[in-house]
């Protein structure tokens, strides 16, 4: 159960939804302009290309909107909250143990594990870059304060190059991370973890 003051954000950015919708409108507009031209030859082909393109963007917008609703932490679907709570329920760290959340994003999983393991220290690491610009170390720290967890800290880190000695943590957990690392051997990344 999370505080109403915490802001865990959504893994589907509103900017992405807006960009897809703008692409839909642009393709629809070009299709409309092309449709007003005299028909025949390349103009008909161009019309169909932009009609199909606008349909593609419309379907993509609907699909991404459904994902946005599903991954809304505080919304009616609450899939994110169910996933976070489900993972945290399985993380058991011994007293004075250490846990590591790789790719912590907004801190939701690290904070949930810290709340379930109050005698342990939890560290959340993320690279917090342009790809997920709405997430940051500051956001994680504000969320931890809103949830009243004093046993969780956050720092910049990379899932591909973790700078910790082997066996530094009693538990390592993650959520929505490894599939976002392009062009890497997943087994190699998991072994690094």
Q: Where does each model-flagged region fall?
A:
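Short, small-residue-biased leader/transition segments that mark boundaries at the very start
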Residues: 1-2
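Class I SAM-dependent methyltransferase Rossmann-like catalytic core
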Residues: 12-18, 62-83
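Conserved class I S-adenosyl-L-methionine
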Residues: 95-105, 123
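Conserved SAM-binding loop of SAM-dependent methyltransferases across substrates and taxa
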Residues: 106-118
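A short, conserved alpha-helix within the catalytic core of class I
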Residues: 181-192
């Amino acid at each position: 159960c999370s505080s109403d003051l915490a802001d865990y954000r959504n893994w589907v950015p509103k900017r992405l939804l807006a960009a897809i919708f703008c692409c839909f409108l642009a393709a629809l507009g070009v299709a409309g302009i092309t449709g007003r031209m005299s028909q025949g030859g390349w103009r008909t082909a161009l019309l169909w290309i932009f009609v199909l393109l606008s349909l593609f963007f419309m379907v993509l917008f609907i699909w991404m909107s459904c994902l946005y609703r599903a991954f809304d932490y505080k919304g009616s679907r609450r899939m994110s909250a169910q996933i976070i709570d489900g993972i945290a329920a399985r993380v058991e760290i011994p007293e004075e143990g250490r846990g590591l959340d790789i790719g912590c994003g907004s801190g939701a999983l690290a904070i949930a594990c810290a709340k379930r393991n109050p005698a342990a220290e939890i560290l959340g690491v993320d690279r917090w870059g342009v790809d997920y610009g709405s997430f940051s170390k500051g956001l994680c720290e504000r969320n931890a304060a809103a949830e009243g967890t004093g046993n969780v800290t956050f720092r910049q880190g990379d899932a591909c190059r973790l700078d910790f000695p082997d066996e530094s943590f009693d538990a390592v957990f993650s959520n929505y991370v490894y599939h976002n690392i392009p062009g890497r051997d997943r087994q190699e990344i998991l072994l690094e973890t």
